[in-house]
Amino acid sequence: ECENTECPRACPGEYEFDEDGCNTCVCKGCDDAQCRCSSDANGCESFCTCNTRCSAADECNPRCTCK
């Protein structure tokens, strides 16, 4: 039986199916290649974009959670 999985905010519709046929989120977090953060003035994430590899250090602030 599947849990009702909700993907992180800013990643709507980014689902994939696991081996049980349950949907899971593709976008995992800032240390994942599938999630890019943009940081605000306080160094916290303002939004994240799924399925994009990070290209700059400041786009992957380690304090970001992207969740």
Curated annotation (Swiss-Prot):
Residues 2-27 form the Antistasin-like domain. Keywords: Disulfide bond, Protease inhibitor, Secreted, Serine protease inhibitor. GO terms for cellular component: extracellular region. GO terms for molecular function: serine-type endopeptidase inhibitor activity. Eight disulfide bonds are present. It is found in: Secreted. Belongs to the protease inhibitor I15 (antistasin) family. Potent thrombin-specific inhibitor. Homodimer. This is Theromin. It comes from Theromyzon tessulatum (Duck leech).
